[in-house]
Curated annotation (Swiss-Prot):
PANTHER family: MITOCHONDRIAL RIBOSOME RECYCLING FACTOR PSEUDO 1, RIBOSOME RECYCLING FACTOR. Responsible for the release of ribosomes from messenger RNA at the termination of protein biosynthesis. May increase the efficiency of translation by recycling ribosomes from one round of translation to another. It comes from the Bacteria. It comes from Psychromonas ingrahamii (strain DSM 17664 / CCUG 51855 / 37). This is Ribosome-recycling factor. HAMAP family: RRF (MF_00040).
Amino acid sequence: MINEVKSDAQSRMDKSVEAFRSQLSKIRTGRAHPSLLDGIMVPYYGSNTPLRQVGNVSTEDARTLTVTVFDASLIKAVEKAIMGSSLGLNPMSAGTVIRIPLPPLTEERRRDLIKIVRGEAENSRIAIRNIRRDANNDLKLLEKDKDISEDEQRVGEELVQKTTNDHIKQIEDLLVVKEAELLEV
């Protein structure tokens, strides 16, 4: 039973780390990366569709992304969606290809992005701690119902704490790497 509680907590913590990793990929660094445009939705036949479903996003060079739109009638809508995003990008179309030059990040913008990244990291740490709390409560309930002994409860809590520490360390490692990327000129 302890292993079930621990494995449930572990899988939920893994999802929190993965969600943090996904959030980081959407925050712009100095380099062009196709995942930068993942959050952009394009109006297509009356519903919002992810950009990746209406075109192919690729990297042309270190500072330029290209979007090859599958349907030429969507070029204006894709450009408008990219301009309307909070990324501060100005797309230029050439036929069915849209080029998106990435302006260099200013020092002030880098500092703002680092604050955002740190906030996301803190939210992920809080989520992981909440999962730990839930797992410890489950262990206490098992002990209260006499399904496990007090010693087994303590051992279970130690296992959950170790898992929590491992996942918070993963968050910290991802944070350090992203901050270094943002500060790189």
